[in-house]
Amino acid sequence: MEIPILLDQFYLTFGIEKYATWRPEKAPHAIICGATGSGKTYFTKLLLGKIALYAENCEIVVCDFKNDDDYIFLDGCKHFYRYMECQRGLETFYQAFQSRQSGEDKTRNMKVLLFEEWASYLNSIDKKEQDNEKRKLSNLLMLSRSFNMQVIICVQRADAQYFSTARDNANLIVGLGNLSDESRSMLFSSYRSEMLPDRKQGTGYMLTSGTNLTAVQVPTISNMEKLHKVVREAVNR
């Protein structure tokens, strides 16, 4: 499955809309990084909509630790968790993973976990709980692809301390806006010298499986209500 997710800026300079694509089965799991105002959440909602459209019977779990109005359209949905409910959301997804791993669940429709503001969530709980939550995330990043499960983590900074040893298992990296030197080094280490400091809101860089650095632009969502509808359906499954 190949999902068109971002516009390639090189082609846009010639007036050509060519999409950079993501193949989750080949490059599992994603980290989306960007400061406040970079367009990170706008892109994340677009990505969820694309997944819901392209992956038949996809089930999405959304953990929104920010608890602002960005995901208010999901209020009342079966697998929507806000603020401290996010702990239950992660556990729900982790149990679904364990059910597939143990053979209890034989289904293989795509299941997706989106966790907004993972680092802020970890900083809100005590050390013992942090270690337990990071262990779950590490297991998901390392093992869940085989069971058609994907993890999408949104952060302002992708410090290794928030991912235990499994950050490199996220194969789709999207950095929006002008990332700090530290974030470029952490996520785009081999290409940081090629990243220009001219990124505006909704523009950035994409890396797939550690290669093919691409300057990208987030497409405009032409029908927000349609996007909300397909995402709601997936979060309610």
Region spans (language model):
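AAA+ P-loop ATPase catalytic core
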Residues: W118, M206-S209
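Short, charged phosphate-coordinating catalytic segments
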Residues: T220, M224
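Short gly/pro/ser/thr-enriched loop/turn and capping motifs at secondary-structure boundaries
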Residues: S180-R184
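P-loop NTPase catalytic phosphate-binding loop
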Residues: M1-V112, A119-N178, F188, L196-P197, ...
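Conserved C-terminal "switch" segment of AAA+ ATPases
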Residues: R192-M206
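Short, mixed charged/polar active-site loops
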Residues: T211-A215
